[in-house]
């Protein structure tokens, strides 16, 4: 029996490229909140559509912002 042909999912567009953002800064909490889930976890690359290098920079910026108390470590909702 033949296997059904699986279609590849459509690649997500890079939100940083479409917004023309080159530098990711830990002080830009409005931008960083787009990459954090409602539970306070950093969203995966496959969800956000950013490149490997940008994902690393986002993760570092989020961790720095959390350390500086600009972003919460977890969600406030319980």
Swiss-Prot record:
One of its GO terms (biological process) is translation. GO terms for molecular function: small ribosomal subunit rRNA binding; structural constituent of ribosome. GO terms for cellular component: cytosolic small ribosomal subunit. The keyword Magnesium does not apply. PROSITE patterns: RIBOSOMAL_S18. Keywords: Ribonucleoprotein, Ribosomal protein, RNA-binding, rRNA-binding. Part of the 30S ribosomal subunit. Forms a tight heterodimer with protein bS6. Belongs to the bacterial ribosomal protein bS18 family. This is Small ribosomal subunit protein bS18. The lineage of its organism: Bacteria, Bacillati, Actinomycetota, Actinomycetes, Micrococcales.
């Amino acid at each position: 029996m033949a296997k059904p042909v699986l279609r590849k999912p459509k690649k997500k567009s890079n939100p940083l490229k479409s917004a023309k953002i080159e530098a990711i800064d830990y002080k830009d909490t409005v931008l960083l909140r787009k990459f954090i889930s409602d539970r306070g976890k950093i969203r995966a690359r496959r969800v956000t559509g950013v490149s490997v290098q940008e994902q690393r920079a986002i993760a570092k910026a989020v961790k720095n912002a959390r350390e500086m108390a600009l972003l919460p470590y977890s969600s406030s909702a319980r």
